[in-house]
Amino acid sequence: MASPLISDIAHSGLTVADLDDALVLWCSGLGFVLERTFTLDVEVTAATTGVRGAVIRAATVTLGPHRVELLQYDPPRLLESAGSPAQVGMMHIALTVSDLDRVLELCARHGWRPVGTPHRMTGGVRAGTRIIYLEGALGGFLELIAPPQLP
């Protein structure tokens, strides 16, 4: 049998406006561990991402086996209008949380706002789970998933 072409998901990436603030949220607030920081110069950024004239300051944070790459482009590219989770090609990062209300408050202090209200699933494998999407002040989406507390 031939080996698979893809063996793993290496990381999820999120472009942020302020890497230092993002690290406070993801590490101090959400409990991720800083694995490394790095910088991509103008040439490497253009070659790998197609974005010309920008430098990337980045950090990789981990939680268990999962890696999130936080990327700050300098200069940043701001959208003219906000995106939507329904926009084709839009991606989000889903986080399993133990205290949804506390994480909502923490994220709000870093510019993340709910796009709806927490919804409690009523059936299926996620019955009792509370779920909500958040949008970053400058774009991007997080999904918070709070399973019911086990006895």
Positions of PLM-derived features:
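Vicinal oxygen chelate
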Residues: M1-L5, I9-A17, T37, A58-L70, S81-C107, T129-E135, ...
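Long, hydrophobic N-terminal alpha-helical segment
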Residues: A2, D8-H11, L30-G31
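A generic structural micro-feature
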Residues: P4-I6, G50-G53, S84-Q87, R126
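Core segments of cupin and vicinal oxygen chelate
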Residues: T15-P65, R102-V103, R109, V115, ...
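Short, glycine/acidic-enriched loop or turn micro-motifs at the edges of active sites
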Residues: D21, Q72, A146
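Short, tandemly repeated low-complexity microdomains enriched for cysteine and small residues
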Residues: T37-L40, Q72, E80-S84, H119
